[in-house]
Amino acid sequence: MTLNNFINIWIRKKHIVYLCPDKYYEDMFDLIDEINDGKKKIEEIIECTICAFIPDSCDFLVAYYLKDKLADAEVKHFYIGDGYMIVWIEEESEQ
């Protein structure tokens, strides 16, 4: 799945977050600007210093990190790219 295909599929969801290790952090803003210029709105970027994209442990680390940062959100989907990760977040409804 390409980055653009992923965005096209998941942009309809409530919340899309970029999560990336700090060594890629500056580059992510350029990528987000390109996507936002194409009318695909990215809401925020979170700098992640704990996830080294180790395949067997990545989902656990990211879920743990986001649980701490976004207590009222549930991690729904991951897309691991070249040095970055997109996370689809669906906020819990207040019922």
Predicted regions located by residue number:
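Short intrinsically disordered terminal tails
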Residues: 1, 90-95
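Acidic, low-complexity, intrinsically disordered interaction modules
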Residues: 20-89
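Long, hydrophobic N-terminal alpha-helical segment
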Residues: 1-16
